[in-house]
Structures are given as structure tokens and as C-alpha cells.
């Protein structure tokens, strides 16, 4: 990764909720075009870490350097601008139920980025075609399956041209038969060169698609190494135990 630009650098990140210390000094770096999966047991701090990266949770201490700027110190509109540069896909779909797909996709680019309605619609149709939903532009969320909703949610993030995509267990709320269609979109996105940080329970995705995997347990990084190495030669007893349970 020496020749790849550092997009995010996390230094001694800590997060406390009252007296509960959820993140206990996380340090790691994410590079351009890298796909990193974050795995680990429930309650280990994975989602909190991801939410800290785009300031949905305010870190208690430490630094998050986004293109060299410590975003832990920014306020107001600067936070909004930062979040525009980081797409986020949650477990739940968070689509506007009173809008059809096209309006769900074009509202933010038109209102926030100043894109013309025609350009936004053209871009939306192009992205919908890439995720196999070109025929659903006029549908409302209530008319879509869970897998379709999550693919639309991914497209909505891509409409803002993010530099990094954050995924917080994007398949955990889906029926089993719909998981594959969302993972296929994420795999295509990874192959296109998008920088991605993915909290996931999908071990096959982590092993086969991610260039690197982080094992987060008890608020600390247990292992952080290339995915094939982490899965083939786990070193820590905690990781061995975890993989034996989930593989």
C-alpha cells in the first residue's frame, strides 16, 4: 500500500458512553481503493467504530485524519461536507417512503450539490442499471423487496460521488435469499476501485473480496492483516475461537 494515498488515518481512537469504554485506543489506516472488512463478535465495537469515522458518534478522544485533516475537531457545516464525502449504508434502508425511487436518488444531489434535475436523473438511471434495477425508477419503497431497497440505498450513496463507502452490516436485515444480490453489488463496487470499509458477518465476502480484514474484539484490534492471511493463519486465540464459531 506504499504507493496508495492515505484516505483515513485513525490514531488512538477512544469512545465512551458514560462509564462504558467501547473503543479502547484504535489505531489503523485506510488507503485509496482498499476494501477492508471489520469482523468480530457482537458488542465488540464494530458499528461504533464505523459511526465514529463519519462523526455520527463523536469520539471521546483520539484523531481521525481524513485526507490529512483531523475531522474530530470540525463543527457545523464542515461535518455535513465531510459526510458527503463518505457514503454510509446502514442495516436498515432509510428510504423516504413517500417518494419514488427516482426522487429518493435525486433529492440530495439536486439540493446539496446543485446538480440539475436532468443530470441527476440521467446519473440515477445509469446507476440503477448497474445494480439491475433500471425498471424500478418509478416504484415506491413499499413495492420493493428488502434486497432491492438495499441496492437502492447503495445507489443513493453513490449519487453523491463519495470518496469512501462505509457499510454497517448491510445484509443483516435481509432474508437469506436476498443477501447474494446485495453482496454482488458490493463486489462490483469493490472491483471498480471504490474505497470501502465494511462491518460484516459475511465471512466469505471478507475473505474473498476484502484486501484486508480487521478483527475487532472488546474495543481493541485483535488482528489486522491481509484477508487471506487472517483467515488462513489466525494468530490470537480469540480470533481462532471466533472463526471456529462462524465458519
Residue ranges, per PLM feature:
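ABC family nucleotide-binding domain
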Residues: 5-227
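C-terminal boundary and immediately downstream tail of ABC-type ATPase nucleotide-binding domains
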Residues: 215-217, 222-224, 228-247
Amino acid at each position: 500500500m506504499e504507493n496508495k494515498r492515505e484516505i483515513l488515518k485513525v490514531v488512538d481512537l477512544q469512545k465512551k458512553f458514560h462509564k462504558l469504554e467501547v473503543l479502547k485506543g484504535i489505531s489503523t489506516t485506510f488507503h485509496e481503493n482498499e476494501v477492508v472488512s471489520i469482523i468480530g463478535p457482537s458488542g465488540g465495537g464494530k458499528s461504533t467504530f464505523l459511526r465514529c469515522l463519519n462523526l455520527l458518534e463523536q469520539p471521546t478522544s483520539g484523531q481521525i485524519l481524513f485526507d490529512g485533516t483531523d475531522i474530530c475537531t470540525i463543527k457545523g457545516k464542515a461535518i455535513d461536507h465531510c459526510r458527503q464525502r463518505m457514503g454510509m449504508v446502514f442495516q436498515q434502508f432509510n428510504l423516504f417512503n413517500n417518494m419514488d425511487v427516482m426522487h429518493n436518488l435525486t433529492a440530495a444531489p439536486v439540493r446539496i450539490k446543485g446538480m440539475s434535475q436532468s443530470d441527476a436523473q440521467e446519473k440515477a438511471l445509469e446507476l440503477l442499471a448497474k445494480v439491475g434495477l433500471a425498471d424500478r425508477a418509478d416504484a415506491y419503497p413499499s413495492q420493493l423487496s428488502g434486497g432491492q431497497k438495499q441496492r437502492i440505498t447503495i445507489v443513493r450513496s453513490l449519487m453523491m460521488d463519495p470518496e469512501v463507502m462505509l457499510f454497517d452490516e448491510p445484509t443483516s436485515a435481509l432474508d437469506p435469499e436476498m443477501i447474494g444480490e446485495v453482496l454482488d453489488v458490493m463486489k462490483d463496487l469493490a472491483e471498480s476501485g471504490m474505497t470501502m470499509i465494511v462491518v460484516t458477518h459475511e465471512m466469505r465476502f471478507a475473505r474473498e473480496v476484502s484486501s484486508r480484514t480487521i478483527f475487532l474484539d472488546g474495543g481493541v484490534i485483535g488482528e489486522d492483516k491481509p484477508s487471506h492471511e487472517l483467515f488462513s493463519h489466525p494468530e490470537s486465540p480469540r480470533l481462532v475461537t471466533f472463526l471456529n464459531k462462524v465458519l
